[in-house]
C-alpha cells in the first residue's frame, strides 16, 4: 500500500480482542477493504469487536452522563491504540426482532412516505399521516390494536370436557393441577359443580367458567378475585412473552391466530382503509411486492406529491437493487432471514447524505444467488464512491476480487488464528501462499457419476406463498440441492411441504431458544458427560460442576456476569468480581481432571476438547462438532453470540447420530471459508452414505456441482417465480440455460 497521510488511514496497533495476537494493521479510508480468513480466525473480533465497538464507545462518550445511562455502551476493546476512526455504521445479519409491528416498510421508512402520500391525496381524506399508522392509536384498528390478527384459544387443547374439575379436566394447563391455588379459585367458586364433567355444564355455567371478567367474591372462606378460565389463562400465559420453555410450549399449543374480522388484516381503522388512491388503499399497496408497487407509483400523475413519490421510488428501487424486489412493505421484519435483514438495513443507508463514515458489513452476499451478487458489488462501490470507508467480512471470491485492500487473518481458527497472514492487493493475495490465497481460484468439476435414488417424497399442489401448485418428487437416498434466486420459492417449497413430515430433520439458521447461559456444551448434551468425568475423578457429585446448580457462584448465580437493569435502557453487564467471570465457586475450581478445572475445560476450543476427551460419549459428540466446522468455538461460548450459519451447523451436529432420516439444510455454506467447503461436502456425503437423504437449499455453486439431483425454482422472485424450471443432474443444469444453470456453467472447470 502506498504511503498515505495519517488522516487517510485507520491505524490499529496491538489488537488483542478475543483471539487476536497483538495485531497491527493499517486500513485505508474511502476504500473497500475485505477481511478474509477461515471462520473463527479473528475477522469479526477485529472489525466488529475492535474497530466498530471503539467507534461506538467514543461516540457515546460525547453525550451527557444523563443520556449515557439510557444507552448500551460497549466496553473498551483490548487494543493498545486506534487512530483515524470515523463514525461507524454496522450493517450485520442480526435479525430485526420478532415484534409484529416492525415491517419492511417501517424499517426502511417506505411506509412513512406511503402514509404521507395517502394523507395528502387519499380520497376521501382520512386525516394526517398518523391516521394511517397501525402503531399509533389514531390509526390502529381498535379490535386487533394494529396487529391485523386476533388471538383465540383452542378449548379442546386447553381442557378435557369429558372430565370434571375434580377429575383433572385442567391438568393440561401449567399450575392448574387438582388441589392447586389456581384450581381452587375455579373449583371452589360455587358458580358451577366441580364433580360434573364440563361437557354437562349449562350455558350459564359455561359462560361463568370460561368468560366471567375479574370479580371480587368469597371463595373457600376468603375474599379473592375470580376470573373465568380463558380470562385467567390469557392474562397469565398469553398476554406477554413467556420466559420458561414449558410455558412457551403451552402457549404455542393452545393459542390460535386468525385474521382480524374488523380490519381484514389491514391493521388500520375503517376510515384509513376507506381512503384510496387510484382504487387502492394503503393496506393493498403495502401488500404489493416492491417491484409492482414501484410500477404503480410510476404511473401516478400527481404533481403535488411528486417529491414524495420520488423519495418512495428511491427506496423501492434500492430494495430491488439489493435483490429484495419480491418483498412487500407489510412483510414482518422478524420473518426475514439474516441475509435479507442485512440488505433491508442497507437500503436505509443508500439514500443517506452522510459521507466519510465507515460502513461495516458481515457477509453481505449471504442468501444471494450468484446472479444477484453483481448488484451487491455495485452497491458497495456506490457507498465507497460517496467518500465512505467500506469494511467487509466476506468469503466469496466475487467480493474479495473487488477489494481495494485485503487483510487476511489466520492461519486457522480460535487459538490457532488471530495473526496477520497477508495485507495488500487482491493480486498479491492470489500470489501469496496463504490458505485464502491458495483457494481464491477454487473451482470444482461437475459430478461424473451420481447416486441412484431409493424412492422419493412426493410433493403435490404446493401453493405456499408464491408457489404455483408445484408437483415435484424429492428423491431419497441422495444429495438433492434446491436452487433459485432469492425469493423464488425454495424455502416455501421445502419448509412448507417437506418440513414437519415424519423422519425429516430440519437444521436451519433460526435462533436457538435458550437463556444467556446456554452454550455448545449444554445444547449438545456433552456437558453431562464432562460433569460425570469430573465427578468420577474427584469422588463428588456431578451437580457441583454445573453453573446452574450446586457449583454456581453465589453472587452471579453461575452467569459469570452481573446484569443491571436500567429501566428503559439496555441491560448493562459487568464481570462478576467474586468468581472473576468463571461462573463456579472457588471450591469447585479446585477439582481437577487431568490437570484442568471445569472452567478451563469449558474455555477450550471444541477441537482441543475433542483431543482432551479422546474417547467415550464426550468425544463422539465433540468430533461431530469438529466435523461440521465448529472446532474453533469454545465449549462455553454463549449461543446468542453465534451466527446463523454456526447455529445451523450446531443443529446438524446434534442430529447426525440418527440414520434413515431426511436432513433439510438451509444454506449450510453460510460463513464457511473456501478451504472448508470441501470438508462440509465430505460431511454431506457421509450422511448420505450412512443411509440418510440430504436436501439442501444452497446458492454456493460448489454444492450444486456436487449434488446427485438438482431442483431449480424460478425463473425469478416473488410472483415471477414459484415454478420448477429444472429437475435433473448438475451436468444437465449447467446446460439448461436457466439463471442458475448459466451461473453454474461459468463456475465449473
Task: Specify the residue positions occupied by each region the protein language model found.
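Conserved phosphate-binding elements of NTP-dependent enzyme cores
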Residues: 1-749
Amino acid at each position: 500500500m502506498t504511503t498515505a497521510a495519517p488522516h487517510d488511514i485507520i491505524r490499529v496497533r496491538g489488537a488483542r480482542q478475543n483471539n487476536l495476537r497483538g495485531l497491527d494493521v493499517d486500513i485505508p479510508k474511502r476504500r473497500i477493504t475485505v477481511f478474509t480468513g477461515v471462520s473463527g480466525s479473528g475477522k469479526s473480533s477485529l472489525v466488529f469487536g475492535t474497530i466498530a465497538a471503539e467507534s461506538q464507545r467514543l461516540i457515546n462518550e460525547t453525550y451527557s452522563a444523563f443520556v449515557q445511562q439510557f444507552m448500551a455502551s460497549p466496553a473498551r476493546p483490548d487494543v493498545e491504540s486506534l487512530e483515524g476512526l470515523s463514525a461507524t455504521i454496522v450493517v450485520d445479519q442480526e435479525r430485526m426482532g420478532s415484534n409484529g409491528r416492525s415491517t419492511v416498510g417501517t424499517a426502511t421508512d417506505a411506509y412513512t412516505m406511503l402514509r404521507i402520500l395517502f394523507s395528502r391525496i387519499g380520497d376521501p381524506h382520512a386525516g394526517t399521516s398518523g391516521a394511517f399508522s397501525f402503531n399509533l392509536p389514531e390509526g390502529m384498528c381498535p379490535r386487533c390494536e394494529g396487529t391485523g390478527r386476533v388471538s383465540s384459544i383452542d378449548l379442546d387443547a386447553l381442557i378435557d370436557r369429558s372430565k370434571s374439575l375434580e377429575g383433572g379436566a385442567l391438568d393440561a394447563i401449567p399450575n392448574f393441577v387438582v388441589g392447586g391455588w389456581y384450581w381452587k379459585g375455579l373449583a371452589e367458586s360455587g358458580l358451577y359443580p366441580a364433580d360434573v364433567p364440563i361437557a354437562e355444564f349449562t350455558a350459564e355455567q359455561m359462560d361463568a367458567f370460561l368468560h366471567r371478567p375479574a370479580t371480587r367474591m368469597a371463595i373457600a372462606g376468603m375474599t379473592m378475585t375470580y376470573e373465568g378460565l380463558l380470562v385467567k389463562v390469557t392474562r397469565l400465559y398469553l398476554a406477554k412473552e413467556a420466559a420458561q420453555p414449558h410455558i412457551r410450549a403451552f402457549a404455542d399449543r393452545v393459542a390460535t391466530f386468525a385474521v382480524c374480522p374488523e380490519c381484514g388484516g389491514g391493521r388500520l381503522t375503517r376510515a384509513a382503509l376507506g381512503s384510496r388512491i387510484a382504487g387502492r388503499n394503503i393496506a393493498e399497496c403495502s401488500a404489493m411486492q416492491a417491484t409492482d408497487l414501484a410500477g404503480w407509483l410510476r404511473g401516478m400523475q400527481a404533481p403535488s406529491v411528486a417529491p414524495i413519490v420520488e423519495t418512495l421510488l428511491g427506496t423501492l428501487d434500492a430494495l430491488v437493487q439489493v435483490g429484495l424486489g419480491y418483498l412487500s412493505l407489510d412483510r414482518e421484519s422478524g420473518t426475514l432471514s439474516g441475509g435479507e435483514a442485512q440488505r433491508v438495513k442497507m437500503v436505509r443507508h443508500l439514500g443517506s447524505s452522510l459521507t466519510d463514515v465507515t460502513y461495516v458489513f458481515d457477509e453481505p452476499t449471504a442468501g444471494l444467488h450468484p446472479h444477484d451478487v453483481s448488484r451487491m458489488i455495485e452497491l458497495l462501490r456506490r457507498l465507497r464512491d460517496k467518500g465512505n470507508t467500506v469494511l467487509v467480512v466476506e468469503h466469496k471470491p466475487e467480493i474479495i476480487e473487488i477489494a481495494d485492500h485485503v487483510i487476511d487473518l489466520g492461519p486457522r481458527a480460535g487459538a490457532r488464528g488471530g495473526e496477520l497472514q497477508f495485507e495488500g492487493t487482491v493480486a498479491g493475495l492470489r500470489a501469496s501462499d496463504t490458505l485464502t490465497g491458495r483457494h481464491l481460484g477454487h473451482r470444482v468439476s461437475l459430478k461424473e457419476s451420481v447416486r441412484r435414488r431409493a424412492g422419493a417424497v412426493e410433493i403435490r399442489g404446493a401453493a405456499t406463498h408464491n408457489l404455483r401448485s408445484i408437483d415435484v418428487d424429492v428423491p431419497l437416498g441422495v444429495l438433492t440441492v434446491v436452487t433459485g434466486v432469492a425469493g423464488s420459492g425454495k424455502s416455501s417449497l421445502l419448509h412448507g411441504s417437506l418440513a414437519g413430515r415424519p423422519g425429516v430433520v430440519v437444521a436451519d439458521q433460526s435462533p436457538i431458544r435458550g437463556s444467556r447461559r446456554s452454550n455448545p456444551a449444554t445444547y449438545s448434551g456433552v456437558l453431562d458427560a464432562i460433569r460425570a468425568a469430573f465427578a468420577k475423578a474427584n469422588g463428588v457429585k456431578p451437580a457441583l460442576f454445573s453453573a446452574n446448580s450446586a457449583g454456581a457462584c453465589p453472587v452471579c448465580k453461575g452467569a459469570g456476569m452481573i446484569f443491571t437493569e436500567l429501566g428503559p435502557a439496555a441491560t448493562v453487564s459487568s464481570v462478576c468480581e467474586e468468581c472473576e467471570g468463571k461462573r463456579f465457586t472457588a471450591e469447585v475450581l479446585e477439582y481437577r481432571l487431568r490437570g484442568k478445572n471445569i472452567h478451563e475445560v469449558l474455555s477450550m476450543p471444541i477441537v482441543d476438547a475433542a483431543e482432551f476427551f479422546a474417547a467415550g460419549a464426550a468425544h463422539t459428540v465433540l468430533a461431530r462438532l469438529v466435523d461440521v466446522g465448529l472446532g474453533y468455538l469454545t465449549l462455553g461460548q454463549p449461543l446468542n453470540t453465534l451466527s446463523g450459519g454456526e447455529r445451523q451447523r450446531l443443529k446438524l451436529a446434534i442430529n447426525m447420530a440418527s440414520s434413515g432420516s431426511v436432513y433439510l439444510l438451509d444454506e449450510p455454506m453460510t460463513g464457511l471459508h473456501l478451504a472448508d467447503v470441501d470438508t462440509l461436502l465430505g460431511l454431506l456425503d457421509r450422511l448420505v452414505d450412512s443411509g440418510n437423504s440430504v436436501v439442501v437449499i444452497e446458492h454456493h455453486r460448489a454444492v450444486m456441482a456436487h449434488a446427485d439431483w438438482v431442483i431449480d425454482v424460478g425463473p425469478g422472485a416473488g410472483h415471477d417465480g414459484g415454478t420448477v424450471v429444472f429437475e435433473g443432474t448438475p451436468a444437465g443444469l449447467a446446460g439448461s440455460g436457466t439463471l442458475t444453470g448459466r451461473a453454474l456453467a461459468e463456475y465449473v472447470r
